[in-house]
């Protein structure tokens, strides 16, 4: 019996410009993914087939720059990073609900040579300068081992996002994994509308630590307007069209995944570790706990 099915279906969202700001269309992308899952699982012979989404992106054309398509501005800053974490988590929940063997998704990004810096193309670096979305993939790459259960009081219900996107309260959610002597937690604050907003105070509790562990080292990485974000540094420099050697080095450094604080020792009390930090809109935090 053949155990491989090639079923081609692009799953994409529809970002727009609303009242002068970018609004993402995550709902459309999720509806397309759900429908694709339903089609595959409607055939008994394919129901248990592993599924990889061959193209899963926020919109359908990587080559649209902000010059003619201002909605592409989301690609330059941390919004694309937050969207990436949000959509992957939502896809995983859809797969769980539909009893689908979801194995991964491909994000299509390209290189666009001889183009202005931060022109809004769907690319991971711009002229060799890493964009925030690449740091989102770096964070996701740190998640390995056994997945842990997560409960978030700030999460928007998955069925609500499927119906209307993230248009009311932001979705403040997390993914956590564990391997030997390490727990890694990715937390994000996502909203479809890229507008200024008050940061969310995150109170994070990790329970079930091994009884013998009394102290841990915590590393806290961050993507926001001021961390792991070369776009902000480029704007601080006056948006140079031809950066000097010194400016280019500064852009390279600002494009790397950065820590919010220096590594810290944290005590374990009663098998728990507690954290409290402000998480801006369209921002991500990665906490790596080792012992």
Predicted regions and their residues:
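Noncatalytic carbohydrate-binding groove/subsite architecture in carbohydrate-active enzymes
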Residues: 1-103, 112, 116, 156-163
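Conserved, mostly hydrophobic/aromatic
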Residues: 55, 91, 105, 137, ...
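Active-site proximal loops enriched in glycine and acidic residues that flank catalytic Cys/His/Asp
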Residues: 55, 109, 152, 187-189, ...
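Glycan-recognition and catalytic regions of carbohydrate-active enzymes
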Residues: 98-104, 108, 113-114, 120-182, ...
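Carbohydrate-binding surface patches
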Residues: 162-214, 220-238, 281-285
């Amino acid at each position: 019996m053949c155990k491989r099915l090639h079923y081609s279906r692009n799953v994409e969202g529809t970002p727009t410009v609303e009242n002068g700001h970018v609004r993402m269309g995550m709902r459309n992308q999720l509806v397309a993914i759900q429908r694709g899952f339903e089609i595959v699982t409607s055939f008994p012979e394919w129901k248990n087939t592993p599924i990889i989404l061959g193209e899963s992106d926020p919109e359908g054309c990587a080559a649209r720059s902000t010059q003619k398509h201002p909605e592409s501005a989301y690609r330059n800053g941390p919004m694309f990073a937050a969207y990436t974490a949000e959509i992957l988590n939502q896809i995983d929940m859809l797969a769980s609900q539909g009893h689908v063997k979801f194995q991964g998704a491909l994000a299509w990004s390209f290189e666009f040579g001889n183009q202005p810096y931060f022109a809004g193309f769907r690319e991971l670096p711009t002229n060799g300068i890493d964009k925030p979305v690449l740091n989102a993939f770096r964070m996701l790459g740190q998640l390995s081992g056994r997945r842990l259960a997560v409960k978030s009081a700030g999460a928007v219900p998955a069925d609500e996002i499927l119906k209307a996107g993230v248009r009311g309260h932001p979705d403040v959610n997390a993914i956590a994994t564990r391997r030997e002597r390490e727990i890694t937690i990715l937390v994000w604050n996502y909203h479809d509308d890229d507008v200024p907003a008050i940061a969310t105070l995150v109170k994070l509790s990790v329970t079930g630590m091994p009884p013998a562990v009394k102290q841990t080292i915590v590393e806290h990485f961050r993507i926001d307007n001021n961390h792991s974000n070369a776009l902000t540094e480029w704007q601080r420099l006056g948006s140079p069209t031809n950066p000097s050697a010194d400016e280019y080095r500064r852009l390279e450094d600002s494009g790397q995944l950065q820590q919010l604080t220096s590594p810290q020792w944290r005590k374990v009390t009663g098998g728990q570790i507690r954290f409290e930090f402000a998480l801006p809109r369209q921002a991500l935090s990665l906490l790596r706990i080792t012992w």
